[in-house]
Amino acid sequence: MEGSSSAIARKTWELENNILPVEPTDSASDSIFHYDDASQAKIQQEKPWASDPNYFKRVHISALALLKMVVHARSGGTIEIMGLMQGKTEGDTIIVMDAFALPVEGTETRVNAQSDAYEYMVEYSQTSKLAGRLENVVGWYHSHPGYGCWLSGIDVSTQMLNQQYQEPFLAVVIDPTRTVSAGKVEIGAFRTYPEGHKISDDHVSEYQTIPLNKIEDFGVHCKQYYSLDITYFKSSLDSHLLDLLWNKYWVNTLSSSPLLGNGDYVAGQISDLAEKLEQAESQLANSRYGGIAPAGHQRRKEDEPQLAKITRDSAKITVEQVHGLMSQVIKDILFNSARQSKKSADDSSDPEPMITS
């Protein structure tokens, strides 16, 4: 029973995050893990990304690396964490095959790597090569607990510095709080543009919910980087390691509830939504009664998408709560209905008491 429940939980996680096995599903599929030193050196010499800021368009992440990053991010709670990713490049795709955590000091809004973290980084990379893992560091990951996957001003500066000296380099952001609330991994992969690079004003990034106290930081820097498409894969080499990791953590999938574990996060979302509504109402009132008519008309047109975004945020909160309730109902039916049915059957099989006049 335990083995089947573990397998079902892991299969559900793989389906929700669209983790696909490498085809064909035999030892030949593990060729993706083969590191060709000559081809990687050739790419480093050619540097195709130097002439095209949007050269890299896709990220291919192994299921093992994804699970390690999510577990690490979740272990930090409301404190930001940081780690590095190892892999290689293949055309316009960055392939992430493994990840490791860094000993860093984090807060609820930023994470800082000190000298001991850099020493650990160098030592880990050297030891990996001695163990036969020739992949280089291809990026860094960190968490944004509860406020979405995007790059802050500090993140943009860090990524620009890394791209200047360690190309090819990738930035991945994971939101562990929204991951628990939504039921699938909330993740984003980004690369920054060179300093001074201009993009068109009609460039629109995918909409996501940003807390009111983070909107300014998001808006100032949102045109300094672009996002990459993320896909996941697993091979026969991953299967055993995934089993070992999953056997340790799968019980949490069934025993935890986003409604209980994320209560503070949901309360914060509702409070943030109320502040956004008050702000929109204030701006709408000013546009109606303040200034001359054309200016007021222009501001009113700008308010419409803001209200639409607030509606989206409200719908997102509602859907996540409904999903949480549905999962609780399903678990109740799965684990309690059989016990209740057995109890009812036992009660009906008891002999009826004799009635004497």
From Swiss-Prot:
GO terms for molecular function: metal ion binding; metallopeptidase activity. One of its GO terms (cellular component) is COP9 signalosome. It comes from the Eukaryota. Zn(2+) binds at residues 142, 144, 155. Belongs to the peptidase M67A family. CSN5 subfamily. Pfam families: CSN5_C, JAB. InterPro entries: CSN5_C, JAMM/MPN+_dom, JAMM_MPN+_peptidase_M67A, MPN. This is COP9 signalosome complex subunit 5a. Disruption phenotype: Short hypocotyl and open cotyledons in dark-grown seedling, accumulation of anthocyanin and expression of light-induced genes in the dark resulting from an impaired cullin deneddylation. Severe developmental defects resulting in dwarf stature and loss of apical dominance. Csn5a and csn5b double mutants are lethal at the seedling stage. It is found in: Cytoplasm; Nucleus. A motif (JAMM motif) lies at residues 142-155. Probable protease subunit of the COP9 signalosome complex (CSN), a complex involved in various cellular and developmental processes such as photomorphogenesis and auxin and jasmonate responses. The CSN complex is an essential regulator of the ubiquitin (Ubl) conjugation pathway by mediating the deneddylation of the cullin subunits of the SCF-type E3 ligase complexes, leading to decrease the Ubl ligase activity of SCF. In the complex, it probably acts as the catalytic center that mediates the cleavage of Nedd8 from cullins. The keyword ATP-binding does not apply. Keywords: Acetylation, Cytoplasm, Developmental protein, Hydrolase, Metal-binding, Metalloprotease, Nucleus, Phytochrome signaling pathway, Protease, Signalosome, Zinc.
